[in-house]
Every structure is written in structure tokens, then in C-alpha cells.
From Swiss-Prot:
ATP binds at residues 10-18, 33. It comes from Danio rerio (Zebrafish). It is found in: Cytoplasm; Cytoplasm, Cytoskeleton; Cell projection, Cilium; Cytoplasm, Cytoskeleton, Cilium axoneme. GO terms for biological process: animal organ morphogenesis; cell division; determination of heart left/right asymmetry; heart looping; pronephros development; pronephros formation; renal tubule development. InterPro entries: Kinase-like_dom_sf (IPR011009), Prot_kinase_dom (IPR000719), Protein_kinase_ATP_BS (IPR017441), RCC1/BLIP-II (IPR009091), Reg_chr_condens (IPR000408), Ser/Thr_kinase_AS (IPR008271), STK_NEK (IPR051997), STKc_Nek8 (IPR044120). This is Serine/threonine-protein kinase Nek8. It catalyses: L-seryl-[protein] + ATP = O-phospho-L-seryl-[protein] + ADP + H(+); L-threonyl-[protein] + ATP = O-phospho-L-threonyl-[protein] + ADP + H(+). SUPFAM superfamilies: Protein kinase-like (PK-like) (SSF56112), RCC1/BLIP-II (SSF50985). Transmembrane segments: none annotated. One of its GO terms (cellular component) is centrosome. The keyword rRNA-binding does not apply. Keywords: ATP-binding, Cell cycle, Cell division, Cell projection, Cytoplasm, Cytoskeleton, Kinase, Magnesium, Metal-binding, Mitosis, Nucleotide-binding, Phosphoprotein, Repeat, Serine/threonine-protein kinase, Transferase. Its EC number is 2.7.11.1.
Amino acid sequence: MEKYEKTKVVGRGAFGIVHLCRRRTDSALVILKEIPVEQMTRDERLAAQNECQVLKLLSHPNIIEYYENFLEDKALMIAMEYAPGGTLADYIQKRCNSLLDEDTILHSFVQILLALYHVHNKLILHRDLKTQNILLDKHQMIVKIGDFGISKILVSKSKAYTVVGTPCYISPELCEGKPYNQKSDIWALGCVLYELASLKRAFEAANLPALVLKIMSGTFAPISDRYSPELRQLILNMLNLDPSKRPQLNEIMAHAICIRPLLNLYTDIGNVKMRRIEKPLSNVQAGPHGRPGGWITSTRTRGGLSSLTSSKMMHPLPLFSVYTWGSGISTPLRLPMLNTEVIQVSLGRTQKMGVTKSGRLITWEAPSVGSGEPTLPGAVEQMQPQFISRFLEGQSGVTIKSVSCGDLFTTCLTDRGIIMTFGSGSNGCLGHGNFNDVTQPKIVEALLGYELVQVSCGASHVLAVTNEREVFSWGRGDNGRLGLATQDSHNCPQQVSLPADFEAQRVLCGVDCSMIMSTQHQILACGNNRFNKLGLDKVSGTEEPSSFCQVEEVHLFQLVQSAPLNTEKIVYIDIGTAHSVAVTEKGQCFTFGSNQHGQLGCSHRRSSRVPYQVSGLQGITMAACGDAFTLAIGAEGEVYTWGKGARGRLGRKEEDFGIPKPVQLDESHAFTVTSVACCHGNTLLAVKPFFEEPGPK
């Protein structure tokens, strides 16, 4: 006992005394179970040893942590975690007749669910799950199960035949002497959930025979109708007399009412409040530092072309790079990378965002006014702009797959197919059922029942596609851009009607329009078709369509009608403000829409509603449109731009130029472009080194 100082006796268990002790090394409070081995029967000693054996196998935040065991004065001492909030049974008793909210019930229940799932995954049966063995932390928010004294480790048998446990929680099969397996723990879990909802036990009687009769007949008082039908049905399912009809733990975890509280655990439990609140870099995108469950920013670095020359001499250039230009930056500017690989980028009106290979969100923002280097009075040379890169830190377990930016709002898609949005809530583009701004990524709850595979943001609306090829849209509805047959706006996702044989693969949002690409390379479009930027005019050759064949606006998704968009296999497409670009399977590049600034890539500025094949470009793999310029990527990493050149749009010091010309990136090795995004007058482009496959020797 050199390590511990006994404080008081807090209970007497089945086999011994329970002490509250203070650990001398760090003054932490721990529980010490004192089990007098010599006075115990063989079965009792085996039970005590079993508890140690089981606790060593378990490691979970919702299970009482095991520290060590040792012998002291012929007694077995087990040191374990102290839960100061008391038992769940005490908590329920103190409620008197004041029923708990359903959210509170589910918050506690899913923690027990996760703990039991961990136990069963270790091939262990708890066999004595009850509210007296479920403990709470000091805030009574975190639930931990304990008391594994009569647990059973399943080595080779799949069932345990001994009848143990508290009578009120014993399952019907145990009353009949049938084997005990995981489904008996499910019954006990159902009893605990019933107790949380009713503040009383499901099965109680004056004597054991009467109790067994109630259990065998499945007779218990109905649950209050203040709770949802889903919760009441879940309890009924878990308390089914037939063990085979009780749900498995993973089925319960997948239940509709459990998904949200389970997700909340991973975003809320264990968060640390920050006392010092940093000034955000922008009004919308900065995370709510110090707010529970929020995303915080960290790891600042600065980068810019002004220091590029000196850094070359000291350190080799990074293998993975992200470049930006536009808004006054006339040549590609390498952004600080935080020593990571960015695999996808997106641009909004004010946001520059990326996703790293490890599934983290990274953002680049200009420093706030006054935070840069001071300039000398009378200086005329303009400093190259600098950017600060930050990781947007979520809670553990969240891996971001892709990001898409709108005007002042952002959507991100996780590897589990869940969409989260944050930023400005105007026009309902966050999809949360309201128009409120959200400064931390928040799950779009209406889509939790679907697995999303891709999402796209326009200026003020969003489209998303599921793994079942369904499409949802929400946000601003002007011009029919949502494809819902009206111009109404929606602040909650709405399912889009698609042709019966159309299998959606990719969605794309423009400023005031939308497109959907199918697995068969068909294209649907809706919204504003000004200048035929969606290809909805009936065009069969090189002649301009008659006014009868011209389409200005559609409110439902329709197949594109302009050749060759409706005849060639289109593999990549992007929409700008007034024009669009498409890439065929053969690597050809077609532009269509306005040509006011030469953004269609032809030598003249004449307006035409006929798609134009950009000459001189071959092997194009991807392309993008800004407000009045176009960008294309070649198979070997070549970057071409054309159109309006003001304020650095083209990545070179030229004004409007209607013929594609290359953009020079500061790369000393061969590279490929992994992702590109254009928005308004800006471009964001990610590259990685290109390594040739070694040939046969």
C-alpha cells in the first residue's frame, strides 16, 4: 500500500470492501477493491481473478479503467478508475417522477452501447449489466460500465451455461435454463434503457417466482407516449422473448435514433474549452475557439514569393505544392503547406480550402489588416502577398474526403458519407432547416440516412449525390437552379427527380445553374442557360440555333441538346459565371457560352451559341472556369489559361488573351496536377511530383 492512501470506504461489494484512495504519486483519486482471498470459496476466488483478467483485456472510455492488482495482507487488491458521479441507479432515483428528455436518455444509452460493443468484441459477456453497475463522471455526462466480477470470457464455446446476474435483469432464456450468450446482455441492456425511460425497473415483483413469471411472459408497464415511437419500439425489440429476434449491437448502433447521439459523442465528449480566444481571420470561416465541439485552428506558417529565393538556397522545395493566382497576384504563388500533401482544393468568394491525404482540412487566408511587416515611408515597391495556412481541427475519428466552397460557406464530405456545412446561412445553403450562420462544421442531419459520395457548391446553392445515385439540392432557387420545378429556395435538402434510367455520378453547381453527369456520360442541366452556357440549345452542327431552338432558363433537369456535348463522352466539366468548359474522353476541350473576354479560346470575340473546340490543345485531363477566363490541364501537367487577364487571372502578366498559353509553375521536377479550382477571378491548383514507372530491364 505504499502507492495509495485510503480515504474512506465507499461500498461493500459481493466479495469485499471498496475503498476510495488517493494515489501518492499524483494525488489522483482511485478505487481500490479489497478482496479477502483466504475467506473466499474457490468459486469466489475464480470470480475475483476473472475480474482482473477481464479488466486487463478492456480499454474503452466508457468502461472503468483498470490500473493494477496486487496482494496485500492476504487480500487481493484491484486498483481502478474512480467515477465521482455515483451510479446510474442513484441518478434515476433522484429524478423522482420527473421523466428524462429523450436526448438525455439516448446520450447515456449510446455510451453504454459502445462500451458493451467493445466488451462483446473481446468475446466477453458482462452477465450483470444493471444501473447499479453503471457509473457516472463528476458532471454526470460520461457513462462508464464496471463490475466485471461475474463476466464470462468465451474462449471456444459460444454460449455460457451458468445462471448468474441480478434477478430483475435476467433474461427469459436464463429462467428456462437455456444457454447464455450475447443476446442475454442485449436483454439486460433493454432493461436499462426501459429504466432510463420509465424511472423504474421493467420487471419487479414481491418474490422470485412472481418475478420469473413476469419475465417469462414479457409483462411490463407501457412506456410514456412522450417518447418517440422509434425509442419505444427499440425497447420492445430488445425485450423480445425470442433471443434470435433481439437486435445485434451493431444493428442498434445503426438505428435511426442512435446515429445522431453516437455522432455527437465523437464530436462533443472530451472536448477542451480554450480560455484564450484568438481573433478570427475572417468573420465567417474562423472556428469558434473555445466553444465545445468546435473546430479550432492551429499550426500557423507564413509563405510567399518574397522569401522563395532565400528558402531555395537553404532548403529544397517541397515535393507537393499548392499555387494560387488572381486578385492582383499575376504569377503563381506557392502557398505554405504545413509539411503535408494536399489532394483536393476548392475556392469560394473568400475561402481557399484543401483536403490533405490524411483527411484533414487546410485553409489559406491573408493576414488581418495591420498584422503584416511594416513598410518604410515613401516605399513604392509592393510586397508580395503572404498567406497563413491553418489546419481546421475536428474531433478524432472524422476524416474529410472532399471540400467544396460557396460564397461565404463551405461543405465538407467525410469518408463515412456524411456532409457537414459551416459559414453563412443566408439562402438556406447550409441545409440545416434554417437561415442561421454556423461557425463550426455541422452535420446536415436530413441526410444522415444516406451515404453521400460527392457534393458541389454554387455561389448560394448545393447539390449532393448518394451511393444509390440519388441527388439532393438545397439553397437559393432563383432561375430554377435547384432542379425542383420551381424557383423557391429551400433550407433543407430536397430530392431531385431524375429520369428512370439516369444514374447520377457527379454533380456540379454554377453561379445560377446546375449540372449532373451520369455513369453513361450523359449530362443533365437546369437553371440559367444564358449564352447557351449549359448546352441546352438544340445544336446539331456549326450553325447558330434558331430562336425557336434557343433555351434561356429551365427549372427541371433536362438533357443537354448541343452537339457534341450530347454525342461525345464527356469526362470532365466545369461552369463559370457566363461560360462552361467540357473535356471529352479523347482529351478534347470544348467551351460554350459567353465569349466577351475571349474565354472560349478562339482568336475572335464574336458571340456564338455553338460549342467551340479549343484548337491546339490535346490530351486535356481536366479544366476549370472562372468569371471570364478558362484553364485547362494537360496529361503531363501543362497548365493553360486564356480569357480575361485583368488582376492576374491568367497567371501571367498579360491582359485579355483569347488563345491558350502556358502558365509557368516554379517546379524543378516533373509534376502532375491533382486538383484545380477557379472561382470569380482566382485560381487554386495542387500538384504532386510525377515519377515514371521503371521499364523492364
